[in-house]
């Protein structure tokens, strides 16, 4: 698929004088630009008047790599954060109501699960204190970063990440109600890299994992052209790539000056959504600062290695939910395709 399959909205076209549903659908053009596991884009939205219902599309869950849906809900949380950042940019205040696990119906449209509701209101802003010009400037920078954000698979340079950026990420994570571990010590990063090697080797030793990964590669979801996607699909399915991937990815881990792990105190859907929101805000912040971000989920997809990571970080009762590299790198021009808003409305 080419860039034509990733339509990007024109901010100047925001329908300020239109009805609430039209404004909501415009904001969703930014929500769908969010990152997601394997570019699965597992979100659906229902719009009625000033209400946007957010659904997790479980038909797009990676049932082998992500059997408990952790990455599914983190991905939906990323889309939710984009929606809220866009609403703030256009002066559309909103409130978010998470649907608790106890109250959530078994299914929504097409077996999708209703996970949150966003209510739009011009009279109430997401960020109520807009007196600070710096705060307003940051919100604008985050919005601009939505279209610019890329997942960067390149090796990172060794130069450090500014302390001011790290402090901002920690503050944002706390505001989202989640934890953030920032691993800058080379020795601990080496230990995480060793876990990465083992995770890749274990996963690629599983034929069902290779088949699932091959399906997503083969349909072009990861941005490759048709021929490259088909070749990649066959390679993943039939070649033992675990050792090669483990070696490559462990080097990526050690190349990063920061390995970040977002954590939660419980294992609820709401916590996973909050982690997704925190990650996307971190990714937008990094983009606005000229930094690169690369999520790496393999360690967290292997239960005993996830437990080892938790012990390494001293998390106690908290759960590691999302891991990513942060640092400086040459730009990665890869642009993965996106489903248009029309395809994710229910």
Please describe what each predicted stretch is:
Residues 1-346:
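Acidic, surface-exposed loops and disordered segments
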């Amino acid at each position: 698929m080419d860039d034509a399959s990733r339509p990007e909205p024109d901010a100047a076209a925001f329908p300020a004088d239109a009805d609430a549903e039209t404004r909501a659908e415009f904001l969703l053009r930014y929500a769908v630009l969010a990152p997601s596991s394997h570019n699965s884009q597992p979100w659906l939205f229902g719009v009625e008047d000033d209400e946007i219902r957010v659904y997790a599309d479980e038909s797009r869950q990676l049932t082998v790599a992500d059997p408990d849906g952790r990455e599914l809900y983190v991905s939906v949380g990323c889309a939710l954060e984009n929606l809220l950042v866009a609403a703030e940019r256009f002066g559309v205040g909103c409130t978010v109501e998470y649907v608790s696990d106890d109250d959530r119906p078994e299914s929504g449209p097409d077996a999708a699960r209703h996970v949150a509701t966003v209510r739009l209101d011009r009279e109430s802003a997401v960020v109520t204190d807009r007196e600070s010009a710096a705060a307003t400037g940051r919100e604008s920078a985050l919005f601009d970063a939505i279209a610019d954000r890329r997942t960067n698979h390149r090796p990172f340079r060794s130069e450090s990440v500014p302390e001011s950026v790290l402090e901002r990420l920690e503050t944002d994570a706390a505001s989202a109600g989640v934890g953030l571990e920032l691993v800058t010590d080379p020795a601990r990063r080496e230990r995480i890299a060793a876990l990465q090697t083992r995770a890749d080797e274990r996963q690629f030793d599983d034929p069902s994992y290779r088949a699932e990964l091959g399906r997503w590669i083969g349909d072009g979801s990861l941005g490759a052209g048709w021929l490259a996607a088909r070749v990649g699909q066959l390679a993943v399915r039939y070649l033992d790539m675990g050792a090669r991937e483990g070696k490559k990815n462990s080097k990526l881990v050690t190349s990063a000056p920061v390995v970040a792990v977002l954590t939660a105190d419980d294992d609820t859907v709401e916590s996973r959504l909050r982690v997704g929101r925190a990650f996307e805000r971190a990714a937008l912040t990094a983009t606005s600062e000229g930094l690169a971000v690369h999520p790496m989920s393999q360690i967290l997809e292997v239960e005993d290695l996830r437990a080892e990571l938790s012990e390494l970080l001293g998390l106690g009762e908290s759960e590691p939910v999302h891991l990513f590299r942060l640092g400086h790198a040459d730009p990665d021009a890869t642009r993965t395709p996106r489903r248009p808003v029309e395809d994710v409305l229910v």
